[in-house]
Amino acid sequence: MTVKTRFAPSPTGYLHIGGVRTALFSWAFARHHKGEFLLRIEDTDLARSTAESVNIILDGMKWVGLDYDNADNVVYQTRRFDRYKEVIAELLAKGDAYYCYCSKEELEAMREKAEKEGTATYDRRWRPEAGKTLPEIPAGVQPVVRFKTPLDGVTKWTDLVKGEISIPNEALDDLIIARADGTPTYNFCAVVDDYDMGVTHIIRGDDHVNNTPKQINILKAIGANLPEYGHLPMILNEQGKKISKRSGDTVAITDFGAMGILPEAMLNYLARLGWAHGDDEFFTTEQFIEWFDLKDVSPSPSRMDLKKLYWINGEHIKITPDGKLTELVKPRLALRDIHETEKPALEDVLALVKDRAQDLNALADECLYFYKKQVPAEADVAKHWDDEAAARMLRFAERLEGLEDWNAKAIHDLFKPFCDEEGIKMGKLGMPLRLAVCGTAKTPSVDAVLALISKEEVLKRIRA
């Protein structure tokens, strides 16, 4: 059997971080088992499902690197209405579905009664049964189509995350599978799609647990082999509450990209939200695929920890090739009005500073002083700069100007003799030198920094 999983987002304007975690686990499960990962766009909400909102999903999937095996044949529900109507007609013909003519007022009365009695909402008055007389069909009423849910027994499955789950069928309504205007409903469309796509494992959020028994009964009615189900726990914000855009939480996956998070780090972090491989916190996507097993997913909710996300991101920045980092940082430098990054070569700069930042924006900031002296912080000036330091910098500039070879070793070899002559420790030279050349007291080894900045530029900055 070829394992087939799917990710089925609805285009709502952004790709939710929780959806990406679901997609990641589905993708990793398929890749681990050498199977297929499929994408389906559940776009039946025509008011919200614009081309732009669909592209946001596709772009988000591309950014995080979750490739899908039906890229040339993505399933769109709006293109499958004829298929849904065909299956509904089959269910009606077999007696597994029926027309219901209840008015809104009748349904509301049933709902109130059910809440009081703790029973299923719909009283099944239009459900055909042997020996039962149905009400007279009202004039001018367009019926909905309901699925004929079994009245006895239980619907159960062994959830790949939550374990054994059992729901009494008497607790289930006769689900509406087609509205009065003929459009099919979510649960029905999802069942038909999963059946036609050959999905073997449905991995999704645990907010779908209550949908599962309804979908299982429909699958049985159409004669399908049942897939296995795994329901993932919710992701909570740092306060332990449901992630919400209204609460100021970052929820769109593209927003994390704007924050300077690498896609590989995002996947690494999301993988650790609910799944564990021993004490491993930092790993590559390839390692995650190799290690991933749903039995290692906790059924308990996971809590966001942005501090840990940034730490993981910093670790991924360290192992990212300098050439790749260059392409990621260059546009961020352009936003900071640094457009010429050939002298010094940005790739060389990044090789020196990439272990000093935990996101790409901070990394771009770390590169600025190589191209333009920054305005020093008042606290640094007060601590490391005075008239004596200024005079000392001019004297050291003369030593630098005398160098024939401009490299880190040659610059470093000037430090000790100069400090001995001045009767000072290295800090009295290094910190003012950083301020004079870079505009900050926090840099990598100052000889390496000066070596990357040209001799002419270093002397110009010191003597400015």
Swiss-Prot record:
Keywords: Aminoacyl-tRNA synthetase, ATP-binding, Cytoplasm, Ligase, Nucleotide-binding, Protein biosynthesis. GO terms for cellular component: cytosol. This is Glutamate--tRNA ligase. A motif ('HIGH' region) lies at residues 9-19. The keyword Iron does not apply. It holds the Pfam family tRNA-synt_1c. Its main location: cytoplasm. Its EC number is 6.1.1.17. Monomer. Belongs to the class-I aminoacyl-tRNA synthetase family. Glutamate--tRNA ligase type 1 subfamily. ATP binds at residue 245. One of its GO terms (molecular function) is glutamate-tRNA ligase activity. Catalyzes the attachment of glutamate to tRNA(Glu) in a two-step reaction: glutamate is first activated by ATP to form Glu-AMP and then transferred to the acceptor end of tRNA(Glu). It comes from Neisseria gonorrhoeae (strain NCCP11945). The gene is gltX. It catalyses: tRNA(Glu) + L-glutamate + ATP = L-glutamyl-tRNA(Glu) + AMP + diphosphate. A motif ('KMSKS' region) lies at residues 242-246. It is found in: Cytoplasm. Gene3D superfamilies: 1.10.10.350, HUPs.
